Curated annotation (Swiss-Prot):
Species this protein is from: Ajellomyces capsulatus (strain G186AR / H82 / ATCC MYA-2454 / RMSCC 2432) (Darling's disease fungus)
A single cellular component GO annotation: cytoplasm
Protein name: Adenylosuccinate synthetase
Gene3D superfamilies listed in its UniProt record: Adenylosuccinate Synthetase, subunit A, domain 1, Adenylosuccinate Synthetase, subunit A, domain 2, Adenylosuccinate Synthetase, subunit A, domain 3
Reported cofactor(s): Mg(2+)
Amino acid sequence: MVTIVLGAQFGDEGKGKITDLLSQSATLCCRAAGGHNAGHTIVHDNITYDFHILPSGLIAPDCVNLIGTGTVVHLPSFFKELDALKAKGLKDAHERIFISDRAQVCFDLHSVVDGLEEASLAGKKVGTTGKGIGPCYSDKAARRGVRIGEVLEEGVVEDNLRKLEAGYRARFGELNYDLEEEIGRFNEYRTKLQPYVVDQMTFLAKYRSSPSILVEGANALMLDIDHGTYPYVTSSCTGVGGAIQGLTLNPTSIRSIIGVVKAYSTRVGSGPFPTEQNNAIGEKMQTIGREFGVTTGRRRRCGWLDMVMCRYSNSINHYTSINLTKLDILDDFDEIKVAVAYKLDGKRLESFPALPGVLDKVEAEYVTFPGWKSTTMGITRWEDLPANAQRYIQFIEREMGGVPIKWIGTGPARTHMIEREV
């Protein structure tokens, strides 16, 4: 049976920790979409691991890992990340990671184009990670991309890469890019990559009867190409639909869909953010929460928890349970606010706006809670939480239509987690 872990907000919710926890009993852990633009940090046995393209199930010694068909794979990053895990003691990681032969190749050329496209937007930049994800997915949709399986065939990458480079040069002029160097590197990858490449359908068939398959979502619903705050989104489907499509999952095999919700809100890059706090409150969240992007190092914008957004996210992903993260970051706030509705020109909106221009103008309507002003760091039992923290959590559950908050993060370590019987 399949468990899917998905971000319910703008990403950076802390999906890696619950994935790490669940992967200890999983047979298989998979990435379904996205690329090395994702970033998960996991603290395990006092060692900090940063994951980007690799599934974080690699930390679990008995868990096999798959990078699925819906992803885009930057091979230099793949091998660099794998080497970093080995250096930190995961010596057998290379034996437990596989890539679908139908996944797309993300080239250095795509990163160059990403930067040029962002620059051309001037004051309306999307705020991408600059990793080339958007241009790679664009080439996939235009049917001119290169698949992982084609890297193993002599001459295929060179022919296609020369065509891609010529097309982008015709569009942008001379590029700050070494075509011959990248072609040469892929000639080396032709042999180096071979042990990792699999036919996803055949590979997954071996695990169909597995009691525990874990899907690790990347980014989050509000960055989904269809359902997010378009155009300030990533270029893949980040919700449950993307997981099913990217891994060819049987929908009837899905046992649970876990929505990961940070106890406050953050966003990296441009785009509307109705509950953003451009003030001392936002600065305090940023400082205490160490809100810097794992992938880019950029400062994350911070604000109050937005239940309008979370309800919208739930209506698309249909969460069966919630993992609330980073509760401890709110320990020292005198009062805590939660957005429960949007108003535009004094009138409550009935649905989540599709247009970014409307989202930029809405006024958030808040419910205010007294803070608990005591530490929750490291608490592992519900009954040990301060009463005001319990009320805050129960309110979120009600606002989510009764979806239970089963896990509550109270610190960075794997052990800093409350698991409730719900």
